[in-house]
Amino acid sequence: MKKFWKTVCAVALVGMVVLPVQAEEKTITVGTMSWEDLTPITGITKKVLENAGYTVKVVEFSEIGIAYAALTKGDVQVLASQTDYATQDYWNKNKNRLEKLSPVSYGLYQAIAVPKYVDIDSLDQLNDNADKFSGKIIGIEPGSGLMSDANKAVKDYGFKLQLLEGSTAAMTAALKSAVDRKEWVAVTIWEPSWMAQKFDLKFLKDPKGSFAPPQAYYWIGHKGFSAEYPHAREVMASVYVPLADITAINGAVKDGKTMDQAVAGWADNHADLMKRWANIKQ
């Protein structure tokens, strides 16, 4: 009997096939928006992944809806986004096909701001000073999360001022023109932004809570990314870029550097940190 079972076991062992563990892919396609708060995050994370042995391709989008569509289809594999408020609608619509990987920064705030020489401090003071603002609030691109909140504020506060839709470039030009003349101006703006520092702005208090509170930035991926790229996910989860550093990188860009040069300068100044991030163990 013992010989019989030994024979059976031997045959079974011969018939077993040991399947090799599938190696993790080393090429990752990263999506990014051409926004000043997201491009530094993307650039730094790209460098860390490259230092960890990955080949990283970056695809830039001009519309957040297109970026989310590309992520759900797998045209890009990861994307940095503010899923709690700024892009919440897109996240909620697609979250069954996506996964949240890790937080990468915190503190985004979007609201209405004025130069510090303007002697009001709250949104509920705008109506009493509408004439000083020429009856308008200078907005940015329609359809953005910031403009959605700004339209909510118009209703919540019953603003007599008109919220003007336009572009970030047009808003910046109007802001610069007003500040150069020390005129009163109200704009929709965000932090981190070089503009908040350059033009010495202050956010107006929002007692009715029309605007979202400070928001986190997350790396999000298509469904299954963590399983397909377990080590890359761990590397990305180690990366955290403080808001002040994002602002500093954009300040360097405003002073004439390219984004790649500004990110490279930041990386050189944080070489030990970059090395620790890249060498994170799975």
Question: What do the predicted segments below correspond to?
Answer:
Residues 27-43, 62-64:
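Extracytoplasmic "Venus flytrap"
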Residues 45-53, 130-163, 268:
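Ligand-binding cleft/hinge of the Venus flytrap
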Residues 96-146:
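A conserved helix-loop-strand patch within extracytoplasmic ligand-binding domains
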Residues 42, 59-97, 173-174, 194-200:
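Pocket-flanking alpha-helical
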Residues 70, 76-80, 142-209:
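Ligand-binding pocket segment of bilobal, Venus flytrap-like solute-binding proteins
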Residues 1-9:
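Bacterial N-terminal signal peptides that target proteins for export
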Residues 18-23:
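Sec/Tat signal peptide C-region and signal peptidase I cleavage site
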Residues 109-119, 215-228:
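A bilobed periplasmic-binding-protein/Venus flytrap-type ligand-binding module shared by bacterial periplasmic
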